[in-house]
Amino acid sequence: MIRHRLRLALSAAPVTATGRRTRSKTAPRRSLSTQQTQSSASSSSNNLDGDGRAFVPLRKQLKDESKAKRLTGRGKRSKSASSQVEGWELTVGIEVHAQLDTDSKLFSRASAAHDDAPNANVALFDLAFPGSQPWFQPATLIPALRAAIAFGCEIQSVSHFDRKHYFYQDQPAGYQITQYYEPYARSGALWLYPHDGIAPEDGDAVRVGIKQIQMEQDTAKSQELPSHTVLLDFNRVSRPLIEIITLPEIHSPATAAACVRKIQALLQSCGAVNTGMEMGGLRADVNVSVRRTGQVEQHGYEGVSGLGQRTEIKNLSSFKAVEDAIIAERDRQIAVLEGGGKVEGETRGWTIGSTETKRLREKEGSVDYRYMPDPDIGPVVVGAELVERLRTSMPPSPDELLRMLTQDPMYMLTVEDAKPLIELDDCARLEYYLDAVDSLVVLQRDAAAAAAASAASTVSATGKTVGNWVLHELGGLFSRADAAWDGERVPASSLAAIVHLVGTKQITGSTAKSLLSTVFAGEHGGRTVQEMVEQDGLLLRPLAQEEYVSMARTVMAQHPQLVEQIRQGQQGKIGFFVGQIKRMGERGRVEAQRAEEAVRSLL
């Protein structure tokens, strides 16, 4: 059933209005003193700053700074980077902001494409022109609902939008439209397991509650030049986001990073998003607090009480940044409290390669943001029929796929092999693997039918063997060629044919790898695998046992000292004789196992 649902999800048109799969890189926002909006032409054609110096992108500056710190030893990881600090309890809550996979923006019909020129996709409302009105785009709701279903949330039949007021250069209206009071989804959960990367002390599973998921609009992308000039790209304004708010139920940095990683995987698997943290499509804010073990403090949030004073670290753009920033802030708060100080509620920042967080501003509360219902946007009404239709069309989750690949008798992969198939190439490698197993099953059935009449060799290749070839042999070819995954380069049926031939001992393992390389390089001349094997004389000619023994006797007579060493217990040297026998026989036609058996019989 899961396999069938996977096929439908990957091949059939989904019940959604998803857009093109485009990618963009998002530079971190910084607090700047001057603002300037420039067009695509001026920002792309001029690579000099206002003082005539070469312009260096902010992301490259940060990477260079991080590298310099590592070289000088100033960027070393905290000595207390373990998951726990004796005598202290860490508590973390996470807010994940994810860009939805849609064609249009949330409140205008402007394109939500990621790779267009700066300020090319901007409506009047995006720039807060006087008199412009928000126009909610219903299609943006579909991927948001898919995300809520993936987290097992209770989808609200009616939700409303609110205004969150603040003044910053990336928000021209002076407020952000979000869903503070009545979000569209509540009360979900996320389960984390050891294979997700949780801390060992968290045991076999961790349940992280999802308080709510709300839709909201994104802000502009800002870029600071060295001359105190700020470039603003309003393409990103009003792109649809969802904010996933977890309960503060995480108690280790590693588990917090695993939580964000699992959230991204779920969002991608259900088709809600098409870019992750690595491309700027997902950002995380973390709330960090500490308290002495067993002590009840006076603070709390999201319905959880008894916590220490929390601080919020904004705009973390990688899984490692999530873990490292939490470690640094935990250590800072513990040092403050042990020194007799008081942790202040504030918003802090984290820089790549840093060893400490930095204060940005005092932590705002709901009163500071002056939340109010947006009078220009009506309620969002979601019917039960739509929710059920989306629910039944959902593809299997990563956990369901993992169970299928590791527990189904047809596959029986290890967790270490199953996870890359699920996580790599947007499931394209997994689909290729399933096709290859299907093709191999057909070949096995044909061979079994022929065996009843001609006593053919028994087929022993399994889904586990196919997994090894897909991940390691074929994956290695792509890696060495520095090429992106392309299943058409070696059709799944061709790989299955190679695995079948070597599994039935019609060709040797080295011949199989050579065939795979030939097909990968496109040097097969349009021939099938079977035609290459037959026409190039690659079929394994079975040697009689007497021939193996004769070759073994010859090579052993040439190395009597090695024979004596093996008899004295140095069994590893048998491989030398096997190699010599393979060289004596016709190239690629000696079975290593039978050669070893012949050597052992003479010992």
From Swiss-Prot:
GO terms for cellular component: glutamyl-tRNA(Gln) amidotransferase complex; mitochondrion. It comes from the Eukaryota. Transmembrane segments: none annotated. It catalyses: L-glutamyl-tRNA(Gln) + L-glutamine + ATP + H2O = L-glutaminyl-tRNA(Gln) + L-glutamate + ADP + phosphate + H(+). Its EC number is 6.3.5.-. SUPFAM superfamilies: GatB/YqeY motif, Glutamine synthetase/guanido kinase. Residues 12-59 are annotated as: Disordered. Subunit of the heterotrimeric GatCAB amidotransferase (AdT) complex, composed of A, B and C subunits. This is Glutamyl-tRNA(Gln) amidotransferase subunit B, mitochondrial.
